[in-house]
């Protein structure tokens, strides 16, 4: 870690320090802090000149923190909206996974010997106790919050807020105010696309995390803290960028296999303690209100909020990186609004990482033919082309005991050897002439000698005699004379690569050197000439055990830890030496094969109406043969029905006991319902529509009561849930995509 150093004027500084670094006074915050610059308003007005003066300092540490000039009392225009009054237009929820363990780093550096620091005003967060008025109390509270954050990160969902309200101008920096008018958005290093003429603010709550991200090699990023709680920021300089990428690939092997640029997804966080333990230089700082953090090209940085906070972010090109363009001021430096999403600056496709290097694959797919025989389409030889059409004929390969035809994977040396065994007139002198200038020694047998043991023995004998070496080829004879009888399908072919995977490890390719059927394993030559014995169960073929494994083997059921929560805070996490890792924990509905289902609201429909509709469809009646029913007759019939039903249920009857009263009541209600339905059917059979409506209005018993509606709705058959399947990719796209694409709701069927 860097010690606390304060550089003086160029004449008094070390010779290794450039004079550009010393023109502006700065100091280092703590043992692992970044430079803090407190410029005057005259030094900060011209942003382009300011960046030039601190360029080497920023490249060394990766970022610098700029404190608001003391002469600027109100940095924002009073006519515009204050940051505290801004309402977020969109809130997103997402999970951030942690890779690596977090532990406290004990520093042996004496903080008392640090260089002098200029006094600054400490803004104590509202979340901390009110008695934390001194800087020491503030730092202690921040340290406790950071430790609690890393211990409980994977147990909470994080919230992110965005708004498209009019931007707040930096009127005290004229160069930035002028540059904001252009709003040029750098997408895939294209200088034509234009950013919408609106501002973008970012809001976060407690534990809202900005995972590790990196800017374009030509871009500077400025993070402006508009108000609210502080943010903890981590910075990795560009000099350690490659080391960080390699370490990230080792810690997150699954994500690295799915996409080699998985860091651009911004869904994995690596604790700084793990990085420091592996030799990655990591700086940290606490960004407070009215402070700016400027990151330089190639710098990886990450942050999380210690409370409610509002940020503003924009990026611009470096004057020296844009050598092909003549930029006279910062307005032409392509200042643009930029969200906390790498997709806006780093569009990429999700392609799995190549398991073997290009050199390793070229060993299989490239010919050792002269340049004149290589086609113009590329270095790869056509699959169906033969090496020498004159020396081979199709009739030589009709019988099962004959030598297999030459393969495009065979070299000239292998093809010549095969031709020697097919031709009866070729002499040893002609054969020796074929090996002139041959420097490459084959480690495996030619493909033409796989199923012909006699030719194989002759080939090994000739190889030892002509090369004069003691290359030991295995004398293993295949047990299966036919490929169809081999346990693996398709059967292994010597010299060809096959995919393999041990347990839940990474997928790798290996060239088949031997097929040990008696031991049920293959001898594979992997990258860097490593020879590995792989059982048949680990070969990824359609007939192997690995090919028949269920999805649960690769996505096992995870057990949630027994953690007690009190108002959302785990209270017994101290009982564990370390919290169990929940990095791969996802909701059951988001697992593959279990799509998200949406059940629409059920419309309640009375059973009586459905019964009437069924009767009308099953027994149609003609309105010509049926005479209209007078209204008076209907009323009389209804009164007689009610009187009849009242006489049925007699409480004085000894048969109607306390236990049998409910059965009698059910039967009476059923009879009443049947009579009512018959009356309704007669009403609907009337030919005159006006008479029918009149009858319905006058008949009170025809209209079902509220109790009838509730009983009928309870007996309805529920419809099957409509499957609005949303894949896991769509879910991740919704929670992590940039704001300008979120407005396109065609990506989310459930939100249309």
From Swiss-Prot:
Main location: nucleus
Biased composition (Basic and acidic residues): 427-438
Keyword Glycoprotein: no
Residues of the JmjC domain: 162-333
Database matches in PROSITE patterns: JMJC, JMJN
Record's compositionally biased regions (Polar residues): 391-402, 409-423
UniProt keywords, alphabetically: Nucleus, Transcription, Transcription regulation
Subcellular location: Nucleus
Region (Disordered): 391-438
A GO molecular function held by the record: histone H3K9 demethylase activity
Domain of life, source organism: Eukaryota
Quaternary structure note: Component of the Lid2 complex composed of ash2, jmj3, lid2, sdc1 and snt2.
Start and end residues of each JmjN domain: 34-75
Protein species of origin: Schizosaccharomyces pombe (strain 972 / ATCC 24843)
GO BP annotations listed: chromatin remodeling; regulation of gene expression
Disulfide linkage: none
SUPFAM superfamilies: Clavaminate synthase-like (SSF51197)
Gene from which this protein is expressed: jmj3
Pfam families per UniProt: JmjC, JmjN
Name of the protein this chain belongs to: Lid2 complex component jmj3
Cellular compartments per GO CC: chromatin; cytosol; Lid2 complex; nucleus
């Amino acid at each position: 870690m860097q010690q606390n150093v304060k550089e003086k004027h160029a004449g008094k500084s070390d010779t290794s320090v450039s004079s550009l670094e010393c023109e502006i006074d700065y100091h280092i915050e703590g043992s692992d802090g970044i430079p803090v610059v407190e410029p005057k308003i005259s030094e900060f007005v011209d942003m382009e000149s300011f960046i030039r003066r601190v360029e080497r300092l920023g490249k060394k540490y990766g970022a610098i923190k700029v404190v608001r000039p003391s002469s600027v009392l109100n940095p924002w225009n009073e006519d515009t909206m204050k940051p505290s009054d801004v309402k977020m237009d969109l809130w997103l929820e997402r999970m951030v996974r942690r890779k690596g363990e977090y532990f406290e780093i004990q520093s042996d550096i004496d903080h008392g010997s640090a260089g002098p620091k200029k006094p600054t005003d400490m803004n104590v967060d509202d979340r901390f106790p009110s008695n934390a008025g001194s800087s020491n109390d503030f730092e202690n509270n921040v340290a406790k919050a950071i430790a609690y954050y890393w211990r409980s990160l994977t147990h909470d969902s994080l919230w992110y807020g965005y708004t498209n309200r009019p931007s707040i101008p930096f009127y005290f920096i004229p160069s930035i105010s002028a540059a904001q008018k252009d709003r040029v958005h750098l997408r895939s290093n294209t200088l034509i696309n234009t950013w919408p003429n609106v501002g973008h603010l970012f809001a976060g709550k407690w534990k809202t995390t900005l995972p590790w991200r990196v800017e374009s090699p030509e871009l500077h990023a400025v993070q402006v803290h508009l108000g609210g709680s502080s943010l903890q920021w981590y910075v990795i300089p560009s000099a350690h960028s490659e080391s960080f990428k390699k370490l990230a690939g080792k810690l997150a092997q699954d994500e690295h296999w799915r996409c080699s640029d998985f860091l651009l997804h911004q869904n994995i966080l690596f604790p700084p303690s793990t990085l420091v333990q592996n030799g990655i230089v990591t700086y940290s700082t606490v960004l407070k209100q009215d402070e700016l953090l400027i990151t330089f090209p190639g710098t990886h940085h990450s942050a999380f909020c210690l409370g409610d906070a509002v940020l503003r972010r924009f990026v611009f090109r470096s004057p020296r990186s844009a050598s092909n363009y003549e930029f006279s001021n910062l307005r032409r430096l392509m200042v643009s609004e930029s969200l906390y999403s790498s997709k806006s600056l780093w569009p990429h496709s999700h392609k799995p990482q190549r398991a073997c290097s290009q050199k390793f694959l070229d060993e299989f797919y490239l010919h050792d033919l002269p340049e004149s025989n290589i086609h113009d389409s590329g270095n790869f030889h056509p699959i169906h082309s033969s090496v020498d059409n004159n020396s081979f004929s199709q009739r030589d390969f009709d019988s099962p005991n004959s030598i297999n035809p030459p393969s495009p994977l065979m070299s000239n040396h292998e093809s010549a050897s095969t031709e020697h065994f097919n031709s009866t007139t070729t002499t040893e002198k002609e054969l020796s002439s074929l090996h002139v200038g041959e420097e490459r020694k084959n480690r495996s047998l030619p493909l033409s000698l796989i199923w012909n043991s006699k030719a194989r023995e002759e080939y090994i004998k000739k190889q030892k005699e002509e090369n004069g070496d003691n290359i030991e080829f295995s004398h293993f004879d295949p047990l299966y004379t036919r490929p169809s009888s081999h346990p693996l399908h398709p059967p292994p072919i010597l010299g060809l690569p096959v995919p393999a995977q041990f347990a839940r490890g990474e997928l790798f390719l290996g060239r088949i050197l031997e097929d040990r059927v008696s031991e049920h394993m293959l001898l594979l030559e992997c990258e860097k000439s490593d020879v590995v014995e792989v059982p048949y169960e680990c070969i990824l073929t359609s007939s192997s055990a690995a090919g028949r494994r269920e999805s649960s083997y690769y996505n096992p059921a995870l057990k949630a830890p027994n953690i007690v929560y009190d108002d959302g805070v785990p209270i017994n996490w101290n009982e564990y030496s370390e919290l169990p890792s929940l990095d791969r924990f996802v909701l059951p509905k988001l697992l593959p094969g279990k799509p998200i289902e949406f059940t629409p609201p059920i419309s309640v429909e009375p059973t009586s109406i459905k019964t009437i509709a069924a009767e009308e469809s099953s027994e149609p009646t003609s309105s010509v043969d049926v005479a209209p029913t007078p209204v008076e007759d209907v009323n009389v019939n209804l009164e007689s029905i009610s009187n009849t039903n009242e006489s049925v249920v007699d409480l004085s009857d000894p048969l109607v006991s306390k236990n049998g009263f409910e059965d009698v009541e059910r039967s009476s209600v059923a009879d009443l319902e049947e009579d009512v339905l018959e009356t309704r059917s007669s009403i609907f059979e009337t030919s005159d529509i006006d008479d029918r409506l009149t009858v319905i209005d006058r008949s009170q018993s025809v209209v079902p009561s509220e109790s009838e509606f509730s009983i009928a709705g309870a007996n309805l058959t529920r419809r099957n849930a409509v499957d609005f399947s949303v894949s896991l990719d769509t879910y991740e796209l919704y929670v992590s995509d940039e704001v300008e694409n979120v407005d396109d709701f065609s990506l989310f069927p459930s939100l249309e």
